[in-house]
Amino acid sequence: MSRYVGPVFKRSRRFGFSILETGKEFVKGKQRQYAPGQHGQRRGKLSDFGIHQLEKQKVRFMYGINERQFRNTFAIANKAKGVTGTAFLQLLESRLDNIVYRMGFAQTRRQARQLVNHGHFLLNGKKADIPSQRINVGDTIELRAKSQNVPTILASIETRVVAPWIEKDKFKGKLIRVPERKELNQEINEALIVEFYNK
């Protein structure tokens, strides 16, 4: 399944959940928080399968990755020690594009992925342009010198809050620890995703 590149607002309405994690897509004069379409306000009762699938899709769209990457990440988490659901979310959080987003270099994960693709960052001093690359504790991410005057990046640096598991000065950041489950989105029910893939 390909990556969704359409309007974020439509996806958020479908899920009844802000996939930007800010709620901004529900403002700007767009107050319709029900699902899109003619019958959007009459959201039908979902089957057990539908409930599990909706939760999976919600998280997949939130992190902006395709089905294959999502499933492969879950397979790694399923083999890890500890709670599978928590390990799964922590792996999603460890993607390079997500760390760039958490460091405040971008307003959204979609924007962060685009910045990574365009080669704006160094990982441990070397060019890094693969959004799905895993970042480990102790790794440093730095905005390249030639990118330090990009207006969209500077605007994000000025307005975004840096995640507490990251240490950062203006143009350089370091992953200092793995985030705890309580620090991640509380509207996610990862147990439903675990059940979906383990059926």
Curated annotation (Swiss-Prot):
Gene3D superfamilies: Ribosomal Protein S4 Delta 41, Chain A, domain 1 (1.10.1050.10), RNA-binding S4 domain (3.10.290.10). Pfam families: Ribosomal_S4, S4. The keyword rRNA-binding applies. The keyword Membrane does not apply. InterPro entries: Ribosomal_uS4, Ribosomal_uS4_bac-type, Ribosomal_uS4_CS, Ribosomal_uS4_N, S4_RNA-bd, S4_RNA-bd_sf. Coiled coil: none annotated. Residues 94-157 form the S4 RNA-binding domain. PROSITE patterns: RIBOSOMAL_S4 (PS00632), S4 (PS50889). One of its GO terms (biological process) is translation. Keywords: Ribonucleoprotein, Ribosomal protein, RNA-binding, rRNA-binding. GO terms for cellular component: small ribosomal subunit. One of its GO terms (molecular function) is structural constituent of ribosome. Part of the 30S ribosomal subunit. Contacts protein S5. The interaction surface between S4 and S5 is involved in control of translational fidelity. Belongs to the universal ribosomal protein uS4 family. One of the primary rRNA binding proteins, it binds directly to 16S rRNA where it nucleates assembly of the body of the 30S subunit. With S5 and S12 plays an important role in translational accuracy. This is Small ribosomal subunit protein uS4. The gene is rpsD.
